[in-house]
Amino acid sequence: MKFEELAKAFALKELPESEVEITGDVPADMINEYKDAALTHIAGELDLPGFRVGHVPTDVALKKVGELTVLEEAVELFVKDFYPELVELKKIEAVGRPDIRITKLAPGQAVSLVIVAAVYPVVTLPKNWKEIEKGIALEEAQPATDEEVKQTIDSLLKSRAVPPTLTEDEVKEGKKAEAILPELTDEFAKSLGAFESVDKLKEQIKKGIGEEKQRTAKDARRAKIIEALVAETVVAVPAVFVESELDKIMSQMQEDVTRFGMSFDDYLKQSSKTEEGVRNDFREQAAKRAKLQLTLNKIASDEKIEADKEDVDAEMKHAIEHFPEANMALLRIHIETVLRNEKTLQILEGNKDPKHVASNHEGHAH
């Protein structure tokens, strides 16, 4: 390791909220090794009269910005190389970008650095986490009623109604006509798909409503199990995890708004809110989601739960068809996380050996 001795000299201090502070001094000669690259980088971005951008000579750039600015850039380049070795040597499981402060900077002198980094937090699960589901019963889903079946059929009839027709004179006279509903016959049932008769159609509708009620009951039980688990799990959630969840929420929200034919800026104007205001509205929800994900990660790690490769491959194939421009490596990680979450949640629900789970293609298993 190039910086092993220097890294050993840096002091490590644990901070609240899953952060650490690393402090130390960097010899001037180490920083000086980066000054030429720093000056070249600065010169390449300067926009000065008489020169094309990217073609400013380094001596002209130095006179323009001054030695201290070059030194600051050199420190930044040095830290990019030094930081990965530092966290590896200190055995820090850092997440996100560190906050780097220069507390002493002068030509020819050692540079003093203070680095604050978020670290992957310690997650303490409740001792009885495997037993939580036993205290939360699955509420019995009621079968579909005749009225619910009738409402569904009425909706089907209305969706296939024949639009009313009026002559121009009738329109001028203010006449109104109602859409003509088709009759509920075996022929109508057959037109909807593989239904031989009205009775078969009603039978399938009744079955579908019943299955939906069962899914709703299962979802409600899962939500209660999650709520109980997260409430008893102890973890200091780093801000970077909350911000990451907020980014996901905002991205989904922007997609939803766009789908309805409105720009996000117009949505903000109509809502009399700023983007930061909307983020703050969802901050509590994002914190809960972040805590849940950390909790699921801990269980998956302890129990050695992994997504099955064939399930991941199948989901990748589906996702690529819909998002061909996506980063394939990141997409695979995302799918693996979603499927691992689903397996973990099924185990939480009492399923000892979940097989071949599938995502809902919406990106969140929770």
Label each PLM-derived region with a short phrase.
Residues 1-366:
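FKBP-type peptidyl-prolyl cis-trans isomerases
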